[in-house]
Regions:
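Structural preference for solvent-exposed beta-strand-turn elements
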Residues: 1-207
């Protein structure tokens, strides 16, 4: 079924029960109140198979912690195709912490959270930001996610939702070397005041 068209129809339907019926393999009818829609689907055989991600060796992460890491780093990902490795977010998994890093070569965002009793296999994963954005939006903060890795895929699931994504291949650049080690220049600022000032200045700032 065309996903975009189905989403648009569902968004406009009234808060009433929806009856869904299928005739053949490629025709679906949706009925809600006095509204009736007929959709022409695609052959089932053309739908891609799910990646071979087995959750036997999975680990668990609180969705709220994952959302915090994503929202503080994914915005810095590069959108240029010349360096595809920077089009992903680096997710570092360690025994006692997990960290996400993103950079476009001009700016860098990094956030780290402590982890107690982690069962995640230590390693580095490079995840597409679009997949992380879907995870951030689909899973409530209070849920605990089950995560597993396949050959080149990553799977996230809760009792009712599953998300799979292909990982970005290749070694991530050594971002640590661009972060000053002995930097005595820093400042403390009120977050609300700084955010307000930046919003005012961005009105006249050029791209």
């Amino acid at each position: 079924i065309p996903a975009k068209k189905l989403s648009e129809i569902a968004r406009e339907l009234p808060p009433s029960p929806v009856k869904i019926s299928a005739s053949g393999e490629q025709r679906v009818t949706l009925e809600c109140g006095r509204s009736k829609f007929k959709l022409l689907g695609l052959p089932r055989d053309e739908f891609p198979t799910f990646p071979s991600v087995r959750f036997n060796d999975s680990w668990r992460v609180k969705s709220g912690e994952l959302q915090k890491l994503i929202s503080h780093t994914a915005f810095a990902v590069s959108t240029e195709e010349s360096r595809p490795i920077l089009n992903g977010v680096l997710w570092e998994l360690r025994d006692d912490r997990m960290r996400m890093v993103a950079t476009n070569g001009h700016r860098l965002a990094k956030m780290e959270l402590p982890v107690e009793g982690s069962t995640a296999p230590p390693g580095d994963l490079i995840v597409p930001p679009k997949a992380l954005d879907q995870i951030r939006r689909l899973f409530p903060a209070e849920e605990e996610l089950e995560i597993a890795r396949g050959d080149n895929h990553l799977g996230f699931r809760s009792p009712f939702t599953s998300v799979f994504t292909r990982l970005v291949e290749g070694p991530y650049p050594n971002y640590e070397q661009v972060i000053p080690k002995d930097n005595d220049r820093y400042c403390l600022a009120d977050k609300a005041a700084l955010t307000s000032a930046l919003k005012r200045m961005s009105v006249i700032a050029s791209d």
